[in-house]
Amino acid sequence: MTHVEVVATIAPQLYIEETLIQKINHRIDAIDVLELRIDQIENVTVNQVAEMITKLKVMQDSFKLLVTYRTKLQGGYGQFTNDLYLNLISDLANINGIDMIDIEWQADIDIEKHQRIITHLQQYNKEVVISHHNFESTPPLDELQFIFFKMQKFNPEYVKLAVMPHNKNDVLNLLQAMSTFSDTMDCKVVGISMSKLGLISRTAQGVFGGALTYGCIGEPQAPGQIDVTDLKAQVTLY
């Protein structure tokens, strides 16, 4: 069984309000990583992100900071073209205080360009979470394993795969793919079966070799997320 860090996802509208700071502080003991979603901010800039990071830095000794721009293609609000998206991800390397950066994987990506950006982020001491999300369904087991395999070829620190289950077998396939991958590959793995049906993938993440589990602060930011305080308590049981 692996050690699991609890990620708390926040999605502020440009400014970090004092009420949000209070909510984070109230749950500080349950948070290992704070995920700052930025795709909900229209035409977000690096300078705007840097300002938010400065506000969060006050508490940063308590947790690592992950920045994520989730594109509409993978279930987020982000409307950037692929080039604008990749330029933003690359430029995040210059912001002090960011520990981890999410970069999406698709089957049709420019492999060489993706690798250059990932290497660039790592040269600035940013841990890379390469991720793929399917909000419609759960692919067959062999396809799940193939996606994990393709993502790990970029040598990231983490590979994350989140899929939508329609039955218990979908959940089992995701857990099996994650477990097999964690036993055979060097990078850390994250596997999420979304919605209430897949909640066990969040609470028992470590049993199947997972390294991160995502919760929320108040309103869920993805199907199946529960408050990080409850999530931490559940993860600790394992």
Swiss-Prot record:
Its EC number is 4.2.1.10. InterPro entries: Aldolase_TIM, DHquinase_I, Type-I_3-dehydroquinase. 3-dehydroquinate binds at E35, L36, R37, R70, R202, Q225. Pathway: Metabolic intermediate biosynthesis; chorismate biosynthesis; chorismate from D-erythrose 4-phosphate and phosphoenolpyruvate: step 3/7. It holds the Pfam family DHquinase_I. Keywords: Amino-acid biosynthesis, Aromatic amino acid biosynthesis, Lyase, Schiff base. It catalyses: 3-dehydroquinate = 3-dehydroshikimate + H2O. The keyword Iron does not apply. One of its GO terms (biological process) is amino acid biosynthetic process. Belongs to the type-I 3-dehydroquinase family. HAMAP family: AroD. Homodimer. PANTHER family: 3-DEHYDROQUINATE DEHYDRATASE (PTHR43699:SF1). Involved in the third step of the chorismate pathway, which leads to the biosynthesis of aromatic amino acids. Catalyzes the cis-dehydration of 3-dehydroquinate (DHQ) and introduces the first double bond of the aromatic ring to yield 3-dehydroshikimate. This is 3-dehydroquinate dehydratase.
